[in-house]
Amino acid sequence: MATVEELYRSYGILADAKDDVGQHKSAYQVIIDGVKGGAKEKRLAAQFIPKFFKHFPDLSDSALNAQLDLCEDEDVSIRRQAIKELSQFATGENLPRVADILTQLLQSDDSAEFNLVNNALLSIFKMDAKGTLGGLFSQILQGEDIVRERAIKFLATKMKTLPEETLTKEVDDYIFSESKKVLYDVTGEEFVLFMKILSALKNLQTVSGRQQLVDLVSEQAGLHQTLNPADPDSVDRLLQCMRQAVPLFSKNVHSTKFVTYFCEQVLPILSTLTSPAESIDVQLEVLKLLAEMSSFCGDMDKLESNLNKLFDKLLEFMPLPPEEVENGDTAANEEPKLQFSYVECLLFSFHQLGRKLPDFLIAKVDAEKLKDFKIRLQYFARGLQVYIRQLRLALQGKSGDALKTEENKIKVVALKITNNINVLIKDLFHNPPSYKSTVTLSWKPVQRTPDSGQKRTSDETSSTSPPKKPIVGPKRDSRQIYNPPSGKYSASVGAFSYEQRGGFQGGRGRGWGGRGNRSRGRIY
């Protein structure tokens, strides 16, 4: 067992040898043996072993293993010192192994130790990004769940801090191909993180890159399968995937496949969908997603059939006027509930797809059904005007902080909803129906006009040509509820309340593929 004096003596021999350091193998072996000593010897060994490591390839395995022993020492200060120096072993063929080891060390619950591991990983990333990624993905695919989770989060948060020259096209391609392997079996939270990782890749900022991401989401969403409305996991999966897809669509990257699936598979069973969480109005979430996607729908094979499905669903949410009693009044308990939030989504989607078949209401819908629709439309429009007046009156004279109260914020959103519906209904009242108006969906931010002297942005304000957005996951907004005097509003209006939860309900391993839990231990 080497003593402190022997360690210093051996260090002196190696330091003084300069170009001939490789000839003093026995001195380096003494330093390696220092890991068997006490705390002082171990601390010195943790510093000395990496310093001369590159000069003794024959002892590389024993030197690295000795350093790893120190990384697992009971003394936290020794562990930290050993981890801090690990990146010095990342040369040549050793780099992927060191990356693998550092990835496993991410499971540390000591914050200082965890930060050292992160810094070491970033440091070897700059030496060899692809080799480092090999170690990370090895653990993501095969490691313990805690290691997998932290490795994914490392990629999602730290890669954006790397110098641009580190992430070459070859590295981007490697990340994409390895990520596709991981995505065969992920939880909902992992899927969202991987979309964040992939969306940040320079290679995928192009139209073809976005299309690749859309295809990836399509596979995850299971658009080739029939949706089981009774399975909350299946519904949850669809919602999460669609929320990741929406920011990717543009005039060049179409949502046709997704809109078709919603019209054919989801709308007919909308009322039977099982919500993945009590706080989620799953029908409204689905309709909002459909509305957002409809702006980017390309040529559709079964356009008339899908417009019919959308039209039928719209009719469900647009009630007929109540029958009048003998004195000409309407019984209060018979007055239909006007569900404005749902109707905004359905009308917007119908308006978008109707542009592609402008004679649908004239030539494709029979006379009786069209007459019924116009009666419903007129009744809805009358109720709409009442609420618009009430809302404007309630908000009249209010500005600044007064509009920031929760109640008034909800009323502002409600006014957006009713104004949108009003514009769309006016288009449909035209003879023939018009599809020229543009509105911004009530839960989408309105692009402000740039101040004079400021550089004008390239973003559009119309929902039919929405602003270009970075390819990132959706922001989480709080649900806003508006209860007008007569209680005819949908119970929920405003922004998406859907939360990205980790995993899914039920005992299905990782939720999307049943990885299951393994306890592998460290596999240095």
Curated annotation (Swiss-Prot):
Please indicate which superkingdom the organism of origin belongs to.
Eukaryota
Q: Which UniProt key words apply to this protein?
A: Apoptosis, Nucleus, Repeat
Q: Where is this region: ARM-like and Heat-like helical repeats?
A: 1-360
Q: Where in the cell is it found?
A: Nucleus
Which residues does the annotated region (Disordered) include? Answer: 440-524
What would you give as a GO molecular function for this chain, any one?
RNA binding
UniProt motif Nuclear localization signal: location: 455-476
Q: Name one GO cellular component term.
A: nucleus
Gly residues bias spans? 503-516
Task: Tell me one GO biological process term.
Answer: negative regulation of apoptotic process
Q: Give one Pfam hit by family name.
A: API5
Matches recorded under InterPro entries? API5 (IPR008383), ARM-like (IPR011989), ARM-type_fold (IPR016024)
The role this protein plays is: May be an antiapoptotic factor.
Quaternary structure, per UniProt, is:
Monomer.
Concerning PANTHER family, the annotation shows: APOPTOSIS INHIBITOR 5, APOPTOSIS INHIBITOR 5-RELATED
| Family classification | Belongs to the API5 family.
Q: What is this protein called?
A: Apoptosis inhibitor 5-A
Organism whose genome encodes this protein: Xenopus laevis
What is the gene called?
A: api5-a
